[in-house]
């Protein structure tokens, strides 16, 4: 396959998988409705957003299969790579960060116009800057859990809290194969302690008040492949095992509003040069994805 270029060097589309709009009129078709934006702010999430076409899904699936190989020549560019992060010896949960640096298609989903426009709206029309990506793959029959958690509990090394997460399926996601579940309005609970992400599904319960436990009513987010769901950084969410006959492959894009700053002098992602505490998140690894048109 030859030497792999670090695609973090390029802050625009590198393939023809997406068409980037050139006019305000072209952007219009990607906008969320007012009702969708209101749902996000009231409940902490908005789901059922079409982000990918069938041919784009196929390209991403193909590139996912390639980069999952630990012998891939771009393997050293991952921030994290866990062929199995599950703490259950009978389950498998593939999880990685940093594949946008390796795969053209996973690089270009950062600039998917349907994604960046929705993110811009949900971040209250602020410019959108990239934080990091994730891949989660649960194989058929023995896919592991992702425990209940809030994303920002792992991200306090960046401030202010003006982050956003988008989860997109490369397979149909159902309760049978381990789809995402949300606790509606839990984004109003404040910041909770961070449990082990691939450990006990209910580890977070130890940190909840009796009132929060009473409100803990999971809602499954079943989605067709190519559709996404956006959630607030304090949204409590997780996903159960995959006991079905089909895999559950998905990627996650995490972003924040431009102007977010580092809250540590340590490295923010493995192998990424530190950004001094108080300095703005920007540069090679944190590209600006969308600003006001």
Placement of each model-derived feature along the sequence:
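Short, P/G- and charge-enriched loop/turn segments at secondary-structure junctions
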Residues: 151-156, 216-218
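Double-stranded beta-helix
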Residues: 16, 173-236, 260, 278-279
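Phosphate/oxyanion-binding loops and surfaces in catalytic or ligand/nucleic-acid-binding neighborhoods
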Residues: 67-70, 125, 173, 189, ...
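Non-heme Fe(II)-dependent double-stranded beta-helix
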Residues: 2-43, 49-148, 154-155, 195, ...
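Short, conserved beta-strand element in jelly-roll/cupin
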Residues: 156-175, 222-223, 230, 254-258
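Short, structured patches in soluble enzyme cores that scaffold and shape functional sites
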Residues: 134, 150-152, 168-172, 184
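Non-heme Fe(II)/2-oxoglutarate
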Residues: 2-26, 70, 88, 192-197, ...
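A short secondary-structure junction signal
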Residues: 141-142, 147-150, 158-159, 176-182, ...
């Amino acid at each position: 396959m030859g030497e792999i270029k670090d695609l973090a060097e390029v802050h625009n589309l590198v393939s023809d998988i997406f068409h980037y709009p050139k006019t305000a009129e072209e952007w219009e078709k990607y906008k969320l409705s007012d009702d969708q934006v209101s749902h996000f702010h009231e409940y902490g999430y908005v789901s059922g957003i079409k982000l990918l076409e069938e041919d784009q899904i196929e390209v991403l699936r193909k590139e996912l299969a390639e980069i999952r190989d630990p012998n891939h020549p771009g393997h050293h560019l991952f921030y994290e790579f866990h062929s199995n992060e599950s703490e259950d010896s009978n389950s498998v949960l593939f999880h990685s960060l940093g594949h946008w640096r390796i795969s053209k298609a996973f690089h270009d989903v950062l600039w998917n116009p349907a994604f960046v426009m929705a993110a811009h709206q949900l971040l209250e029309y602020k410019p959108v800057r990239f934080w990091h990506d994730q891949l989660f793959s649960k194989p058929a029959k023995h896919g592991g859990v992702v425990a209940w958690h809030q994303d920002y509990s792992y991200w306090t090394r960046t401030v202010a809290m003006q982050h956003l997460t988008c989860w997109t399926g490369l397979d149909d996601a159902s309760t049978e194969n381990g789809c995402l579940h949300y606790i509606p309005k839990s984004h109003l609970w404040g910041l909770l302690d961070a449990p082990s992400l691939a450990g006990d599904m209910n580890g977070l319960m130890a940190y909840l008040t009796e009132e929060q436990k009473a409100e803990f009513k999971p809602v499954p987010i079943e989605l067709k492949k190519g559709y996404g769901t956006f959630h607030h950084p304090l949204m409590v969410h997780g996903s159960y095992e995959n006991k079905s006959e089909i895999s559950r492959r998905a990627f996650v894009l995490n972003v924040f509003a431009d102007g977010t700053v580092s809250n540590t002098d340590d490295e923010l992602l493995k192998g990424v040069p530190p950004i001094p505490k108080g300095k703005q998140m920007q540069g090679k690894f944190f590209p600006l994805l969308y600003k006001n048109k």
